[in-house]
């Protein structure tokens, strides 16, 4: 295979992040300097983000049999890079109070971002598996980064063991699919899986095992049990990455698989996915009702959000609007989650033991940090899907595609789930405006809005509001990503 200059340009984000990994690794070996390594990481991620413009000039192409670079890949690469940038930005002040090695944090985030970019470009079950492992392995270390806390170490061990088990299910499922179809390429699967072949027991078993593995990575019921514990035990900046980059890009590659391979044509698979979506929406919202820890609450909330997205995935065969719905919803989910976890990160920085993740820590926040409380309120309203926020646009799209595909009971679940979600999101928002306790707990620095993390949080809030009122620019970007697939 000949590598042309066009191929290299198409792979620029992957190459730049890979080069940044090597540079940061050498920098750590040469001299430990927290500011230097954080700066190198942020510069590398920004350069990769800018390089997407050059990738767009090249056009869609299959760079290798394992990777396809097109508008769809660029959209999800951009979302992963934004989430990685935000994670590094939130981590810097948190690590300032951390007494152990700080620099490896950025190295692990960069490697996870590399896995995310590979997943966004995946066009083959082999690259899908490699990407998932490359994004998962660094997270084992990141989740347990505050290893002197029992909660963080426990979360890391739990996530590592369960993730390894899920990966084995995924790999075994791929082996069964290969045994029946004779190919692992998404396009070849679409050609080889002809009429009636999807009802073959071996193929159904293979896709069933893959659903188990991918369901774990996406925190779908009943593979969700790790989610609240890991979100609570992981440092706040790591929870940011877990909630955004890893979920978004894995869902994106599943969308590509469903688009090329006629997996959704199987009635059995559609029914299983519909049951999982229904259970995720209802269970995720019901479990979030009783939470007093904001990271656990957001963990259960993420289960329900992935359930909403599954509705659009099931409706994929009925029209292109499903692709648009997923893109808009994921963008709204990204900015809302970055803002919410960003506030938790600011409240928890610098590192002083456990994060400020108790709901009690946010009681009366408005009276001494009014702008921060307003940002958190906007994020809660967006996650709840209230009009005038980007979250509402995404949820409206999901309901529209559900109605278009006649998935009435799933549309009902989305409506009921949203109503339940409204209660616990408003409970968080209302607590921000109650009287502050006599003995306040953790607090964000007085100049938080001038820090890099504060700026990211404010920009996220601004985007959620502006795109909630005028979503056309985002919709145009998402539509541009579709014809190139």
Swiss-Prot record:
State whether keyword Isomerase applies.
no
The Enzyme Commission number assigned here is: 7.1.1.-
- The residues that cross the membrane are 8-28, 35-55, 71-91, 105-125, 127-147, 159-179, 203-223, 235-255, 271-291, 297-317, 326-346, 373-393, 408-430, 455-475
Q: Name one GO molecular function term.
A: NADH:ubiquinone reductase (non-electrogenic) activity
Topology class, membrane:
Multi-pass membrane protein
Q: Does the keyword Transport apply?
A: yes
Q: Name one GO biological process term.
A: ATP synthesis coupled electron transport
Q: Which UniProt keywords apply?
A: Cell inner membrane, Cell membrane, Membrane, NAD, Quinone, Translocase, Transmembrane, Transmembrane helix, Transport, Ubiquinone
Q: Which reaction does it catalyse?
A: a quinone + NADH + 5 H(+)(in) = a quinol + NAD(+) + 4 H(+)(out)
Q: Which GO terms describe its cellular component?
A: plasma membrane
> InterPro entries from the xrefs?
NADH-Q_OxRdtase_suN/2, ND/Mrp_TM
Q: Which domain of life is it from?
A: Bacteria
- Can you say where in the cell this protein is located? Cell inner membrane
Q: Which PANTHER family match?
A: NADH DEHYDROGENASE
Q: What family is this?
A: Belongs to the complex I subunit 2 family.
State the function annotated in the UniProt record: NDH-1 shuttles electrons from NADH, via FMN and iron-sulfur (Fe-S) centers, to quinones in the respiratory chain. The immediate electron acceptor for the enzyme in this species is believed to be ubiquinone. Couples the redox reaction to proton translocation (for every two electrons transferred, four hydrogen ions are translocated across the cytoplasmic membrane), and thus conserves the redox energy in a proton gradient.
Self-association or partners: how does it assemble?
NDH-1 is composed of 13 different subunits. Subunits NuoA, H, J, K, L, M, N constitute the membrane sector of the complex.
Tell me the protein's name: NADH-quinone oxidoreductase subunit N
Q: What is the source species?
A: Shigella dysenteriae serotype 1 (strain Sd197)
The coding gene here is nuoN
């Amino acid at each position: 295979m000949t590598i042309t200059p066009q191929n290299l340009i198409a792979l620029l984000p992957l190459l730049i992040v890979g080069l940044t990994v090597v540079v940061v690794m050498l920098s750590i070996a040469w001299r430990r300097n927290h500011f230097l390594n954080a700066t190198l990481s942020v510069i590398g991620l920004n350069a990769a983000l800018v390089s997407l413009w050059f990738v767009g000039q090249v056009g869609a192409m299959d760079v290798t049999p394992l990777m396809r670079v097109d508008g769809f890949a660029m959209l999800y690469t951009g979302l992963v890079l934004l989430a990685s940038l935000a994670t590094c930005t939130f981590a810097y002040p948190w690590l300032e109070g951390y007494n152990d090695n700080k620099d490896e944090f950025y190295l692990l985030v960069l490697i996870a971002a590399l896995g995310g970019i590979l997943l966004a470009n995946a066009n083959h079950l082999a690259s899908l598996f490699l990407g998932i492992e490359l994004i998962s392995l660094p997270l084992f270390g990141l989740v347990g980064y505050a290893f002197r806390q029992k909660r963080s170490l426990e979360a890391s061990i739990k996530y590592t063991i369960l993730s390894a088990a899920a990966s084995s299910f995924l790999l075994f499922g791929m082996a069964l699919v290969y045994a029946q179809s004779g190919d692992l390429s998404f396009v070849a699967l679409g050609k080889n899986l002809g009429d009636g072949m999807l009802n073959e027991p071996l193929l159904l078993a293979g896709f069933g095992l893959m659903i188990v593995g991918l369901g774990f990575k996406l925190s779908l019921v009943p593979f969700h049990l790790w989610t609240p514990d890991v979100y609570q035990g992981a440092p706040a900046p790591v929870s940011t990455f877990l909630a955004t980059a890893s979920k978004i890009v894995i869902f994106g590659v599943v969308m590509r698989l469903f688009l090329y391979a006629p997996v959704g044509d199987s009635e059995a698979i559609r029914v299983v996915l519909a049951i999982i979506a229904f259970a995720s929406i209802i269970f995720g919202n019901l479990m979030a009702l009783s939470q007093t820890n904001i990271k656990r609450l957001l963990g259960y909330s993420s289960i329900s959000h992935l359930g909403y997205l599954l509705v659009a995935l099931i409706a994929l065969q009925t029209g292109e609007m499903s692709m648009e719905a997923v893109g808009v919803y994921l963008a709204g989910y990204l900015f809302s989650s970055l803002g919410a976890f960003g506030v938790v990160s600011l409240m928890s920085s610098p590192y002083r033991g456990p994060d400020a993740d108790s709901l009690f820590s946010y009681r009366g926040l408005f009276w001494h940090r009014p702008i921060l409380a307003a940002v958190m309120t906007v994020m809660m309203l967006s996650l709840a899907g209230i009009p005038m926020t980007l979250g509402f646009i995404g949820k409206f799209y999901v309901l529209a595609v559900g109605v278009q595909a006649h998935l009435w009971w799933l549309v009902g679940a989305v409506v009921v789930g949203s109503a339940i979600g409204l209660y616990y999101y408003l409970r968080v928002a209302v607590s921000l405006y109650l009287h502050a306790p006599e003995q306040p707990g953790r607090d964000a620095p007085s100049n938080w809005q001038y820090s890099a993390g504060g700026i990211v949080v404010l920009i996220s809030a601004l985007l959620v509001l502006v795109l909630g009122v005028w979503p056309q620019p985002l919709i145009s970007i998402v539509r541009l990503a579709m014809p190139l697939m």
